Amino acid sequence: MKNIYNMYDFFESLTDIEDPRQFKKVKYPINEVIGMTLIASLGNANEWTEIEVFCKLHETLLKKYFKLENGIPSHDTFQRVMGMVNPNIIQQIQATWNEYISQNDGEGIKTMAKA
């Protein structure tokens, strides 16, 4: 992953992930699905339905980081897309995310909380 200097860089770096889906069938960009899942996890959303609900409740915040041209994905879409991504890639993303959050004294979280 690229060097991460802020939350925008982090979420932008997710666009480099290979999307295993058929291009013509993609409604939600992979960086948005993964990014929203990570943000929702900070809000204690652990189930796919909780992730969907969290994202719908915080759509204004999420629009700071993502285009959301097609709105918020359903819980089924979150589950399906995340299930298609290589688990090693997900583990690497999670490690980078955790490192960013811890190295910056939670500044990313504070920034999101102000939204």
Walk through the language-model features, giving the residues of each.
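Dynamic "connector" segments at or just before major functional cores
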Residues: M1-K114
